[in-house]
Amino acid sequence: MSEQYPVLSGAEPFYAENGPVGVLLVHGFTGTPHSMRPLAEAYAKAGYTVCLPRLKGHGTHYEDMERTTFHDWVASVEEGYGWLKQRCQTIFVTGLSMGGTLTLYLAEHHPDICGIVPINAAVDIPAIAAGMTGGGELPRYLDSIGSDLKNPDVKELAYEKTPTASLLQLARLMAQTKAKLDRIVCPALIFVSDEDHVVPPGNADIIFQGISSTEKEIVRLRNSYHVATLDYDQPMIIERSLEFFAKHAG
């Protein structure tokens, strides 16, 4: 799938080559690397080799996204993982929202991943399933899900429309990921916002109970909505994830 539109300013991927420990960061559905950039820069500053790709069909125009499948998004993440594998002995993966879903998906297929940090990750959004099976013809595009932030001074760089076809792809990705959670054995630090208007917070419990990891923890974010990586709890997410990397990097 070739994209027809230019990349939006601020939606560019981010790479930093540093030490032998790498971190792959994955942004969310309809979003861009912008939502994960503060974390990527903090990890790079701490000496980690960092890869923050732009998912296929994202960060350009929602018509580009409409032409992609979840396999394209997986391929974008696999490519980033491969880039890190060439440079690093140890790799962690973190992601926001669908980026968290892709984090879980990757851990299901790559048991050598050292640890994962899903942030408001999605494996079950009943509203999507209800919308798809509710009967009647759905519009081609729905309103944006972006910028669910408690901080009124911050805006997420994301599409103003959501392609209905892409929601179906997200539903398929979530279903496949949820079905194989028990394959995950690496340490997991699971962040969840108490108030999230996009992904029900109960997803964190589904993930926690579903994965086979012996080392796993849920950290509740009291002062952020869905896009927690840009919200009030951002410093805490950075601090706790850096502690997690240091602990498990050996």
Curated annotation (Swiss-Prot):
InterPro entries, per the entry: AB_hydrolase_fold, Esterase_lipase, Hydrolase_4, MAG_DAG_Lipase
EC number: 3.1.1.23
Annotated thermal dependence: Optimum temperature is 75 degrees Celsius.
Effect of D196N: Loss of enzyme activity
Disulfide feature: none
Listed transmembrane segments: none
PANTHER family: PHOSPHOLIPASE-RELATED
Protein's name according to its UniProt entry: Thermostable monoacylglycerol lipase
Organism: Bacillus sp. (strain H-257)
